[in-house]
């Protein structure tokens, strides 16, 4: 095997151990898994030792894309800055009105005729993360003694936000069935609803499993939310990145049919679907006026005024393109008519807009094809080493249970894999809030992100499997912390 893995020297491990126990663990006395993992992966002394031992860093599960953004979006951003548009102004606390108008037009296409969004239903935020923290701050202010239920495993920031705002967060996870694995615990969520429940959080598509909620699932949750006056937060960050978009059901489509729009808030962002993570463009939207007005006040108090407003031209162009994709290219004239109130779209000719949609379509088809190939490649390489895997639904992430690691300390394996191969991994405890639940009975779970470099992604998975064999044969040659989470 090319660049065959070698177990580092005792001297190397001794130096790393000193840094780990005398510096990193002392600074992370609470031993929160994600903080500790990041402290190790980013420690300059450890990285220097790895470089000296010819160990190169690689990632297969970071959740950050290596793919480039659509060129049309980059051109729009550059053009707007050259024309001194948007960046010179302060905007309302909900964000630039042109951007919110464009978002309302786009999102309205999914609803029935009895209800529609207005620009006031939208708030631009600092990425989807900013939207999440504002919603939590709203709960803290208006419902401080209420409980939050969350689909688990899930994005770690929800736990961080709940801790920061001193809110009661209860994770809800189903039992794992190897023959029909699912991390979508709809019935379990409903069983755990009490009189103190105020917020239910679901991620659709799910992170990290990539599963998609069915129409039946969404109806169950929204009906009981309406009955008990509960707010449902649906994180749709990955909604555009599905392999079969015709089968994806939008939560507000269901809520509008159930007259439950007041019980729904949706969070979206441009980090994953547009490969624009560094721009921090996000937004939330809801027909719940108490929520949106509270978020506007929070934004005003933070004096953030959303940096996303600086990219209004990009947001407007994307809303137009996604609207055409949703309605089909044959209805582009209707969409152009609807968007005539949006300056960014109005100033473009019909032929420019048609060309933009065609160019984006080619870009997006290529992107999804790339993700699909990485998914198939990963499952093929893992082969029998993947004891449990999820169906191919969402294009960005999945998570697999790795065979033969049930009785291995998750943290120690992750740590030594990084120190030996340079491979950064995100594993089960990264997504489990009650981390004791990720015990030996559940096993070792590895998230895979398909948006990584093709060559490095393949090499990373191969090296992971090779390291597993070496580690299981020689456990005493590696660092042992015996930490559990």
Show which residues each predicted segment covers.
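Charged, glycine/proline-rich intrinsically disordered loops and linkers
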Residues: 5-37, 246, 319-366
